[in-house]
UniProtKB/Swiss-Prot annotation:
A carbohydrate binds at T270, C271, H272. Residues 1-19 form the signal peptide. Residues 100-315 form the Fibrinogen C-terminal domain. Disulfide bonds join C109-C137, C258-C271. Glycans are attached at N213, N244, N254, N284, N293. Strongly expressed in spleen, liver and heart. Also detected at lower levels in lung. The gene is fcn1-a. GO terms for cellular component: collagen trimer; collagen-containing extracellular matrix; extracellular space. Pfam families: Collagen, Fibrinogen_C. GO terms for biological process: complement activation, lectin pathway. This is Ficolin-1-A. N-glycosylated. Residues 42-99 form the Collagen-like domain. One of its GO terms (molecular function) is signaling receptor binding.
Length: 315
């Protein structure tokens, strides 16, 4: 066989092979000649152009939270903010129980007495606002424990003074003094206190008067005197008539010019039943009611030798 014939036959075989793989089969269905149906399967067509993108589907369900990551580094400190406005003031709390005094300190002479101090004299106490104050403690009269805030004894100190002097206090520890209206208010503002007035005439006869619930108001209320009742005493009651009266001095006379007329600061109205801050006149005097007077005692024409006003916690 010649060479070109061999080549031709090989080419036909290859073409036939491609035709069998790429062209569809021919199938005949049916038994009889009239029932036979020829089915020709076509070749696959060329891939068409992609259609337009369809609409987005509905949002899927939220997935589970992932694992927490590693904390990052702390950032730098921010700038300090501006100070805010003060808040509203809260309601006042209920009054607490009295505190237990620290050994070696006291808030009044009664506490010193309870710690074993029995000798009268000047002692340091702590006021309710934490300040210290030197006071004369009477540890002998009627059981002791008294803070003495007024004393007349020899006429060495002038008691016809102005408002600020009575406010701050004045005098000498070894003779006559007034403890000060600010101090009186501070020491009597909380608690219940008993007031005692001790009087001694120039015959050295001593008498007294006692009162319950003594206190002095603050300066804005003109140091008004508060008392509840006369508790007794052979000097008689010459102070109940002054309760709820304002304090007056020669430069701030709150009632009827009494302080100017009777020469001393006191709780006046029109004008007085007593005035232990008047002139020191050595017993009997002809002038009217301007001495160290206690009307239910020796009257308006007798000036006492010694007077002391004192208070302590009420039993």
């Amino acid at each position: 066989m010649t060479r070109w014939v061999q080549t031709f036959l090989l080419l036909v075989a290859v073409i036939r092979s491609y035709a069998e793989d790429s062209c569809p089969d021919v199938k005949v269905i049916g038994v009889g000649a009239s029932d036979k149906l020829t089915i020709l399967r076509g070749c696959p067509g060329i891939q068409g152009v992609p259609g337009p993108q369809g609409p987005a589907g509905p949002v899927g369900a939220k997935g589970f939270a992932g694992a927490r990551g590693i904390p990052g580094d702390i950032g730098p400190t921010g700038l300090k903010g501006e100070q805010g406005y003060p808040g509203a003031r809260g309601l006042k709390g209920e009054k607490g129980d009295p505190g237990v005094p620290v050994p070696g300190t006291a808030q009044n002479c009664k506490e010193w007495l309870d710690q074993g101090v029995t000798i009268s004299g000047w002692y340091t106490i702590y006021t309710p606002n934490g300040l210290t104050l030197s006071v004369l403690c009477d540890m002998e009269t009627d059981g002791g424990g008294w803070i003495v805030f007024q004393r007349r004894a020899d006429g060495s100190v002038d008691f016809n003074r102005d408002w600020n002097s009575y406010k701050r206090g004045f005098g000498r520890k070894d003779s006559e003094f007034w403890l000060g209206n600010d101090n009186l208010h501070l020491l009597t503002a909380t608690g219940n206190f008993q007031l005692r007035v001790d009087l001694t005439d120039f015959s050295d006869k001593s008498t007294y008067a006692s009162y319950s619930n003594f206190s002095i108001a603050e300066e804005s209320q003109s140091y008004t005197l508060s008392l509840r009742s006369f508790m007794g005493g052979d000097a008689g009651d010459s102070l109940s008539g002054h309760k709820n009266f304002s304090f007056s001095t020669k430069d701030r006379d709150n009632k009827s010019n009494c302080a100017h007329t009777f020469k001393g600061g006191w709780w006046y109205e029109t004008c007085h039943y007593s005035n232990l801050n008047g002139l020191y006149l050595h017993g009997n005097h002809t002038s009217y009611a301007n001495g160290v007077n206690w009307s239910t005692g020796r009257g308006y024409h007798y000036s006492y030798k010694v007077s002391e006003m004192k208070f302590r916690p009420q039993p």
